[in-house]
A protein has these predicted regions:
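Active-site nucleophile and cofactor-binding loops and adjacent substrate-binding regions
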Residues: 1-3, 32-34, 146-154
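Structural signal for terminal/edge beta-strands and the immediately following C-terminal loop/tail
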Residues: 148-184
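Glycine-rich phosphate-binding loop plus the immediately following alpha-helix
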Residues: 13, 17-73
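A glycine- and small-aliphatic-rich helix-loop capping segment at beta-alpha/alpha-beta transitions
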Residues: 12-19, 133-142, 167
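Conserved phosphate-binding/catalytic loops in two-lobed NTP-binding clefts
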Residues: 128, 132-158
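Glycine-rich phosphate-binding loops at beta-strand->alpha-helix junctions
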Residues: 115-135
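Adenine-nucleotide phosphate-binding core of ATP-dependent small-molecule kinases
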Residues: 58, 62-113
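Phosphate-binding/catalytic loop of phosphoryl-transfer enzymes
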Residues: 1-27, 171-183
Length: 184
């Protein structure tokens, strides 16, 4: 999903078998979040005495990414700046697209490249340049389909309604069931 945070998740037979940690620090850089950080420099920053624990967390998630560079998390604004000739915005967008593509392509290794389709969702999927840049870099793995917008709340509400009205059942996964072999 391409939004303020970005998750890249691999599914097999309806189950998630691998994913980046979209809230815990393992993510591509986003409009609001930094990506992988150089460890020693991060340790230095944490122990500099300049920032509290909460401030460091906010720098990593909330005030990182585009917010740190441009003071906004609005991808449309950054795209517009690039189109208007802002070199920093153009470079940031190229790096943004490349970083996401690298995360997507790395998931293919888990299934030896046997990927049926790559789905792009979220608000960022409205961006033609974002989508075309990602597609160019990952379509060698699998076809790319785009579903722009954020559907999480709608999906939860609809499925909740279906359950309450008796048109669907709550799925329960056996915690003791053997995990699928990700190397098959």
């Amino acid at each position: 999903m391409l939004g303020g945070g970005i998750t890249v998740t691999l599914h097999r037979n309806g189950k998630v078998i691998d994913s980046n940690n979209g809230v815990g620090g393992d993510w591509p850089f986003t409009p609001e979040r930094v990506c992988s950080c150089p460890g020693f420099q991060l340790v230095d920053l944490c122990y500099s005495g300049e920032y509290s624990k909460a401030e460091i967390k906010k720098k990593l998630m909330g005030k990182g990414g585009a917010v740190a560079f441009f003071g906004t998390n609005d991808l449309k604004e950054i795209v517009r700046r690039g189109e208007d000739g802002d070199v920093r915005a153009k470079v940031w967008m190229k790096a943004f697209v490349l970083n996401i593509a690298k995360y997507i392509a790395s998931e293919a290794a888990d299934v030896c490249g046997k990927v049926d389709v790559i789905l792009l969702t979220g608000g960022g999927a409205y961006g033609r340049d974002i989508v075309s840049g990602i597609r160019k870099r990952v379509e060698f793995v699998a076809p790319v389909e785009v579903y722009p917008g954020e559907f999480e709340l709608q999906s939860l509400a609809e499925h909740g309604y279906d359950i309450l009205s008796g048109n669907a059942t709550i799925l329960s996964y056996d915690k003791n069931a053997p995990e699928p072999d990700p190397f098959v």
